[in-house]
């Protein structure tokens, strides 16, 4: 699981999800990628689940890059607790994903295997996404 080792502040404000991604919008490491089309919080478990789905399909060939990191804590108060008495405890870690952001990249496999592996990974994520190919000279 991806979790920060240390953080300066244990609890943070909720990050905004509006607007488009300003960086990380192009495939830069691999040949294929997953690009987000809608905003979402992606948890560390969802990232790991998508990674496992991809690596199982490509078997020993290819290389996978994860371009997002869950660096924001989301808090939750216990069930049946009265309002007030402070903010809840950190429950899970999320990556704030905006539209246009490339989440995963993949290379070293043929087109058919790459598309199927990325399709399996997209089904594990809580957002709309598309498969993109690297532009220009490889």
From Swiss-Prot:
GO cellular component: cytosolic large ribosomal subunit
Tree of life domain: Bacteria
Gene Ontology process terms (BP): translation
InterPro entries the record matches: Ribosomal_uL16, Ribosomal_uL16_bact-type, Ribosomal_uL16_CS, Ribosomal_uL16_dom, Ribosomal_uL16_sf
SUPFAM superfamilies, per the entry: Ribosomal protein L16p/L10e
Coiled-coil segments on the chain, per record: none
Pfam families found in the cross-reference section: Ribosomal_L16
Sorted UniProt keywords: Ribonucleoprotein, Ribosomal protein, RNA-binding, rRNA-binding, tRNA-binding
Spans annotated as Disordered: 1-25
Biased composition (Basic residues): 1-16
GO molecular function: rRNA binding; structural constituent of ribosome; tRNA binding
Assembly, per entry: Part of the 50S ribosomal subunit.
Function: Binds 23S rRNA and is also seen to make contacts with the A and possibly P site tRNAs.
Entry's family note: Belongs to the universal ribosomal protein uL16 family.
Stated name of the protein: Large ribosomal subunit protein uL16
Organism: Pseudarthrobacter chlorophenolicus (strain ATCC 700700 / DSM 12829 / CIP 107037 / JCM 12360 / KCTC 9906 / NCIMB 13794 / A6) (Arthrobacter chlorophenolicus)
GN (gene name): rplP
């Amino acid at each position: 699981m991806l979790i920060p080792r240390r953080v300066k502040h244990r609890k943070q404000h909720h990050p905004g999800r509006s607007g488009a991604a300003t960086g990380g919008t192009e495939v830069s490491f691999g040949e294929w990628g997953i690009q987000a089309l809608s905003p979402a919080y992606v948890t560390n478990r969802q990232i790991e689940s998508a990674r496992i789905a991809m690596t199982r399909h490509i078997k020993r060939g290819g290389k996978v890059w994860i371009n997002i990191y869950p660096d924001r804590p989301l808090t939750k108060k216990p069930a049946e607790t009265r309002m007030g008495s402070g903010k809840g405890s950190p429950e899970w870690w999320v990556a704030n994903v905006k539209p246009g952001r490339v989440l995963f990249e993949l290379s070293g496999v043929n087109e058919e295997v790459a598309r199927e592996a990325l399709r399996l990974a997209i089904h594990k994520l809580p957002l709309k996404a598309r498969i993109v190919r690297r532009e220009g000279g490889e």
